Amino acid sequence: MASTQRAKPMEMPRISRDTARMLVNYLTYQAVCVIRDQLAETNPAGAYRLQVFSAEFSFQDGEAYLAALLNHDRELGLRVMTVREHLAEHILDYLPEMTIAQIQEANINHRRALLERLTGLGAEPSLPETEVSDRPSDSATPDDASNASHAD
């Protein structure tokens, strides 16, 4: 019987830092998307300039992206910082529960699929009853069907 694999306690701080860094990068990206969409409605030329700038810089490092944006357009950089902070304040309360629930649901689905594959269950999809009953029987021929319709 395989033992359950768990992260070692000394790995948790590193994993937490890496996760937080990734989340900050993602929130920076989302803030830029929100602002780009707002600008598209109010200032299409500004939205285009933000799109062009964003294509030149990677969101893999949100802080480097933000530093470059602040050098390029201070007002826009400050706006990204404000929106990013606002997003963080509103989603982080719900994130732990949502993340755990999604992981648990995904794990159940993966385990179910694995079990079905290992046991051979679900290998052949069954047809709904209506499709089965609408099919002509194997012994019926096209001539039988036309004769039955003209039997009146």
Curated annotation (Swiss-Prot):
Biotechnology remark? Heterologous expression of 12 carboxysomal genes in E.coli (ccaA, ccmK2, ccmK3, ccmK4, ccmL, ccmM, ccmN, ccmO, ccmP, rbcL, rbcS, rbcX) leads to the formation of bodies that resemble carboxysomes, have densely packed paracrystalline arrays and RuBisCO activity. These structures open the door to generating carboxysomes in plant cells to increase their photosynthesis and productivity, as well as tailoring bacterial microcompartments to specific metabolic needs and molecule delivery. The absence of ccaA, ccmK3, ccmK4, ccmP and rbcX leads to less active RuBisCO.
**UniProt cross-references to SUPFAM superfamilies, sorted A to Z:** RbcX-like
Highest taxon in the source lineage: Bacteria
Bias class Polar residues marks the residues at 138-152
Q: Does the keyword Chaperone apply?
A: yes
UniProt key word Cytoplasm: yes
Annotated region (Disordered) at 121-152
Q: Which GO terms describe its cellular component?
A: carboxysome; cytoplasm
Keywords for this protein = Bacterial microcompartment, Carbon dioxide fixation, Carboxysome, Chaperone, Cytoplasm, Photosynthesis
| Induction data | Transcribed at very low levels under several growth conditions; in this paper protein was never detected. Carboxysome size and components vary with growth conditions. When grown in ambient air at medium light (50 uE meter(-2) second(-1)) there are 40 units of this protein per carboxysome, which remain constant under all conditions tested (at protein level).
Q: Name one GO biological process term.
A: photosynthesis
Phenotype when the gene is knocked out: Non-essential, no visible growth phenotype in ambient air or 2% CO(2), no change in RuBisCO assembly or activity. Non-essential, has a reduced growth rate in 5% CO(2), about 2-fold higher amounts of RbcL accumulate. Cells have fewer, larger carboxysomes, their positioning is often abnormal. A double raf1-rbcX deletion partially recovers carboxysome formation compared to the raf1 deletion alone.
Subcellular location per UniProt equals:
Carboxysome; Cytoplasm
GO terms (molecular function) for this protein are:
protein folding chaperone
In the record's own words, the domains note is:
The homodimer has 2 functional domains, a central cleft essential for production of soluble RbcL in which the RbcL peptide binds, and a polar surface which plays a role in correct RbcL subunit arrangement.
Similarity-based family: Belongs to the RbcX family.
Q: What else is known?
A: Unlike most cyanobacteria, in PCC 7942 this gene is not encoded in the rbcL-rbcS operon.
Q: Describe its partners and assembly state.
A: Homodimer. Interacts with the exposed C-terminal peptide of RbcL via its central cleft, contacts a second RbcL monomer via its peripheral polar surface.
Task of the protein:
An RbcL-specific chaperone. The central cleft of the RbcX homodimer (RbcX2) binds the C-terminus of an RbcL monomer, stabilizing the C-terminus and probably preventing its reassociation with chaperonin GroEL-ES. At the same time the peripheral region of RbcX2 binds a second RbcL monomer, bridging the RbcL homodimers in the correct orientation. The RbcX2(2)-bound RbcL dimers then assemble into the RbcL8 core (RbcL8-(RbcX2)8). RbcS binding triggers the release of RbcX2. Colocalizes with RuBisCO throughout carboxysome formation, suggesting it plays a role in caboxysome biogenesis; may also be involved in RuBisCO holoenzyme stabilization or adjusting its packing in carboxysomes.
Q: What is this protein called in UniProt?
A: RuBisCO chaperone RbcX
Organism equals Synechococcus elongatus (strain ATCC 33912 / PCC 7942 / FACHB-805)
